[in-house]
């Protein structure tokens, strides 16, 4: 099938005006899937092979994020891991040297909350795998549904986003998020860390608010009872214990090895979530946090981190200042709250993350703090800072070569490495740009 098939061609396939015959639904489905498949193949980027030789980037300005800036620096990586970094590094004799003089080297950006890999086309339900059936799905591991062929992955890479914390949605307990690398052949290869957080959607304050909060309490109570029964069996105090995959998945939460990320924006939601988490004795992360500045002192005192979503947007309420959302990161920073900046959850808008951080830098947050909010801060909050988020010896060679600060609009991401693999920089946006630039060139020649 020609990947340039037009809408009119598609309609004529569905409906033949001569025979007045409408194609059966299952044939329509097959045709749509075929078009999506061939279109995707035309835009597919081949995943990079594992790093096979030592690579040394020389002459660039290295922004480590955690240990300052190194002018005329050298960074060496082998088998996907940084082995040397500094201004006076003795290069291995067999290293492939890449001169990046005049360029800048940054750690790959991290989007701490989005639906990339589980959302493709909003109008095509079969390409959306965000929500599971039913309200309680703690056992849903998002990486199992991750689509490594998503065209949004290449767009994310081109924007400097090399790690995506893909997050399920819907229901009361949505499932578990996962940190995914933006290159690889399959979900197993792309998973940096599974189970970065258990996702809870705090009930919306409405007529059923108290009832829904109680449902959440009861759910955690059932899961805790399950763990107690299992522990009793392990100690030999009980002979029978029926396994439940939902409650089994929540055991790491009670053992303190998995945080709970609560989607809460309004001040009442945040306050009640804080009280609930303290009662449950669990590690809490606030997601969304539109009103988090109103309880910033409490968040700071309790060391509760916040992942802010959609900084680059309008205020929540008509009476709020026009820059209420732009200035929110700066307010949290001044209050001493640990926070990260995430963009829109929509996979189609994931490339806006650098602009979200850039907007905060224009409204009260320093550029260094804004950069940290999309690198080391989300890495630390989600427990992946031993691998990504900064440029240090022993961490993954997941980095950017750029023309400037990646949160600046004018900056170009010239090349990326993910665990030492030199990734393809083509994406669907660039393909369309080249296509329509050719149209302009043809018009000029005419």
Listing of model-derived features with the role each one plays in the protein:
Residues 152, 157-285, 412, 418:
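Polyanionic/metal-chelating signatures
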Residues 60-63, 392-436:
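C-terminal cap of metal-dependent C-N hydrolases
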Residues 121-122, 127-131, 139, 259, ...:
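His/Asp/Glu-enriched, well-ordered alpha-helical/loop segment
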Residues 47-49, 53, 62, 66-106:
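Histidine-rich, glycine-flanked metal-binding segment
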